[in-house]
Amino acid sequence: AHTSLWHTAWVDENDEYDPTRKPDGNAIKGIEDTMELLRDYKSLDDSTVVVSIKYLVHLVGDMHCPTHVKYPGIKGFNIYVDGRKLNYHGVWDSYVLDCSVRWSGMEFQHILDRCTKREIKAITAGSVRDWFHDCAVYCRQIYVLAQPDQQFKSPDVWEDFLNPALPI
């Protein structure tokens, strides 16, 4: 499908979005194209609107996974937790979530619904590219916290590796 390229996006050496890498598709282009499509949502059929909103939710989530931000010269690698080999991408895509607090949909809604108008305005300020730059700057730290084939043991994995990356 045309969306298979939409799960990651590249930055340059200054952590700015690099549209020249994967110009036929990446998460930022996917978000921008979908937002543009939805500007005229009233003229679209309901199924197109629903699928487009699902894409946005998914892609914004992907961009909050540090390994979905692609940096020049940084490649994927493995680490070990309690002797178990973990792909670094998988650590941030699922391991952290599997080991973290799990909220129900209602609990998550309660947390989000407590934002003030001022907080909502701050959260939604700027463009997609501004937000991606901020995300890229912040997410870069994960490549300092672990090196290829590094060994971690529980519960030290949280103190030495995962907690310093919070609130990613």
Where are these regions (language model features)?
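N-terminal, motif-rich segments that launch catalysis or mediate targeting to/interaction with membranes
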Residues: 1-59, 66-168
